[in-house]
């Protein structure tokens, strides 16, 4: 199967798995008489379970993604989504919604396979284009879903439960699509062959001391983790890779947190609970995200030169908008700010994915993508535990957004610092080059003078 065909199937998978019209209305649905869960229970007892389960599930997921070569992990994501929406449709009470969030956390962790799968089948020269395609496909799925959801709610054609039933049907369909994804050619055979050669050599030396199947398995395991260690050591010396990975982790942490709790803020600002425009907001947000994900592919930006400056400016903008959200009494301001924040993130995470993939020297994209996401979710878990969880500060929703604003201000400060170092380094290098040039000219002039005399 050609890489174009595989990319098309992967894009179809991404579009259908994101076709979940109920997503923008999750908080109104859970707080409605249908589920009868209070807002305080939602953001202190239910939603934190997604963050914690996501963090714990990421560890095996980003290791197994490369070992199992992507497809099985994609299947786990699909099954996790089915379990999530089955619980949303049929479940009752706080504890079942907690299980629902755990299931969604596992599915979210497995999503790493979807975004790294493409790099195992596409030549390096196509990374930027392929990244744009798969991210745009996922965003287009959201676009259609959110538009449909808002239309059905605004026209009173259906209620929140029907939206969740439609979402359940979509995630069941995506499980079938996942079956048709081709398996990526495994590197395990090559490693196992090398391990088998080692075992055969050991057998010649001491037949009684070797058990071939076990030795082969242990040799493969050692070989794989040795490869991981070597890959991480190489990555730790790549400044460009570290820069983008740092932004990926820090920005994803903040944006995930905002996405998790923004509906709680909107709920507080909405005067009429029956007149909810969450779907419109997510529709516009997703349309912009899809456009920017494709548009950035056509921009000729020197990310090595201008990356720190762009990351600094955009993080500062996000910090200002989040503070505005925390102080506003108008839901339209909160809606608009959210759209700008997530659009910035969609655009830059596409650039980050392509730049990180470009810097990698092997097929361990699942490992590196997983490491970045794992750091993000660890930070988010800490943030959730301290700021949101009922066992710690348990801050009100507006104060939470003040904290998130301060968090992005810190991110902006970090990249401002890197930007200043970069400017100083360039200035210093330019001065050194100029001094060297002048010294060389003086030597040449002296040489000419001596030759003439």
From Swiss-Prot:
One of its GO terms (cellular component) is plasma membrane. Disruption phenotype: Worms display defects in folate uptake, reproduction and movement. It comes from the Eukaryota. Folate transporter. It is found in: Membrane. Keywords: Folate-binding, Glycoprotein, Membrane, Transmembrane, Transmembrane helix, Transport. The keyword Transmembrane helix applies. Glycans are attached at residues 36, 260. Its main location: membrane. Highly expressed in pharynx and posterior part of the intestine. Expressed at lower levels in the body wall muscles, head muscles, and vulva muscles. Highly expressed in the intestine of the early larva, levels decrease in the later stages of development. Pfam families: Folate_carrier. Belongs to the reduced folate carrier (RFC) transporter (TC 2.A.48) family. The chain crosses the membrane at residues 48-68, 73-93, 102-122, 136-156, 161-181, 276-296, 306-326, 331-351, 368-388, 401-421. GO terms for molecular function: folic acid binding; vitamin transmembrane transporter activity. It is a multi-pass membrane protein. This is Folate transporter 1. The gene is folt-1. One of its GO terms (biological process) is transmembrane transport.
């Amino acid at each position: 199967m050609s890489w174009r065909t595989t990319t098309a199937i992967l894009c179809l998978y991404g579009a259908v798995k994101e076709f979940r019209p109920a997503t923008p209305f999750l908080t109104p649905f859970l707080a409605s008489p249908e589920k009868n869960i209070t807002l305080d229970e939602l953001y202190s007892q239910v939603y934190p379970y997604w963050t914690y389960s996501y963090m714990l599930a990421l560890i095996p997921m980003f290791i197994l993604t490369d070992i199992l070569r992507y497809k099985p992990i994609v299947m786990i994501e699909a099954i996790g989504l089915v379990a999530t929406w089955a619980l949303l449709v049929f479940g009752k009470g706080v504890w079942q919604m907690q299980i629902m969030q755990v299931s969604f956390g596992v599915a979210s962790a497995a999503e790493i396979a979807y975004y790294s799968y493409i790099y195992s089948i596409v030549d390096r020269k196509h990374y930027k284009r392929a990244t744009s395609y798969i991210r745009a496909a996922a965003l287009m799925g959201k676009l259609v879903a959110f538009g449909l959801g808002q239309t059905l709610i605004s026209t009173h054609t259906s209620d929140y439960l029907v939206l969740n039933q439609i979402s359940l049907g979509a995630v069941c369909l995506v499980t079938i699509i996942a079956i048709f994804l081709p398996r990526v050619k495994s590197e395990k055979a090559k490693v196992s062959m090398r391990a088998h050669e080692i075992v055969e050599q050991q057998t010649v030396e001491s037949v009684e001391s070797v058990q071939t199947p076990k030795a082969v398995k242990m040799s493969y395991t050692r070989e794989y983790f040795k490869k991981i260690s070597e890959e991480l050591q190489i990555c730790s010396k790549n400044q460009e890779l570290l820069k983008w990975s740092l932004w990926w982790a820090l920005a994803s942490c903040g944006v995930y947190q905002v996405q998790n709790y923004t509906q709680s803020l909107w709920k507080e600002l909405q005067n009429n609970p029956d007149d909810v425009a969450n779907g419109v907001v997510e529709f516009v947000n997703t349309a912009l995200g899809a456009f920017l994900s494709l548009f950035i592919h056509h921009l000729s930006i020197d990310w090595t030169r201008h990356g720190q400056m762009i990351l600094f400016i955009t993080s500062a903008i996000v910090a200002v908008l989040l503070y505005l959200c925390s102080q506003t009494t108008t839901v339209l301001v909160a809606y608009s700010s959210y759209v700008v924040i997530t659009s910035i993130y969609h655009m830059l995470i596409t650039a980050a994915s392509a730049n990180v993939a470009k810097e990698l020297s092997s097929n361990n994209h699942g490992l590196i993508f997983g490491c970045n996401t794992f750091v993000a979710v660890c930070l988010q878990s800490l943030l959730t535990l301290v700021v949101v969880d009922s066992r710690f500060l348990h801050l009100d929703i507006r104060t939470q957004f003040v904290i998130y604003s301060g968090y992005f201000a810190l991110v902006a400060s970090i990249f401002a610092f890197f930007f200043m170092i970069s400017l100083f380094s360039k200035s210093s290098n330019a001065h050194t080059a100029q001094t060297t040039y002048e010294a060389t000219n003086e030597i040449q002039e002296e040489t000419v003078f001596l030759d003439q005399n």
